[in-house]
Amino acid sequence: MFHVSFRYIFGIPPLILVLLPVASSDCDIEGKDGGVYQNVLMVSIDDLDRMIDFDSNCLNNEPNFLKKHSCDDNKEASFLYRAARKLKQFIKMNISEEFNHHLSTVSQGTLTLFNCTSKVKGRKPPSLGEAQLTKNLEENKSLKEQKRQGDLCFLKILLQKIKTCWNKILRGAKEY
């Protein structure tokens, strides 16, 4: 006997497709005119870009964070909110006082421009993690340096995505 699902016989779409919510943002943006972004955040993002040594290998590896969260239509605000929370984790790297200052400026400045629902705020971002300890101290130092380079690559890519997403929001605001 053939075992065929009832809904496929009559062309009824699977229930999951019917129940999917319409794509919408969980956050509202304040300051869409771009004044705070261009005068404060953009300056710090550009300074951070100059401080990070660019490695051409960075572009080949797309981090999981960016695979899960993107600056799609109607989700720009929630992407920027999550990205700003992710930036806070990089302050722990203690690269320099100036670097931490710019990271804090971009992170806090972005977070203050958004009013997000508890659905987004309730999530705790994953930690950057630590390299596992090994028996050989030199190997451990090498792993930590590779991890640091990987984190800086991720930070560089994340900053570029943040800048692109902000520009997308500002272009959309000027059209109205």
From Swiss-Prot:
Entry GO CC: extracellular space
Glycosylation site positions: 94, 115, 140
Compartments in which it is found: Secreted
Keywords from the named record: Cytokine, Disulfide bond, Glycoprotein, Growth factor, Secreted, Signal
Chief location bin: secreted
Single Gene Ontology MF annotation: growth factor activity
Record's keyword annotation contains Translocase: no
SMART domains documented for this protein: IL7 (SM00127)
InterPro entries in the record: IL-7, IL7_sf
Disulfide bridges in this chain: 27-165, 58-153, 71-116
Signal peptide segment: 1-25
GO BP, sorted A to Z: B cell proliferation; bone resorption; extrinsic apoptotic signaling pathway; homeostasis of number of cells within a tissue; immune response; interleukin-7-mediated signaling pathway; negative regulation of extrinsic apoptotic signaling pathway in absence of ligand; organ growth
ATP-binding in keyword set: no
PANTHER family assigned: INTERLEUKIN-7
Family of the protein in this entry: Belongs to the IL-7/IL-9 family.
Known function: Hematopoietic growth factor capable of stimulating the proliferation of lymphoid progenitors. It is important for proliferation during certain stages of B-cell maturation.
Name of the molecule in the record: Interleukin-7
Organism listed in the record: Sus scrofa (Pig)
Gene name as annotated: IL7
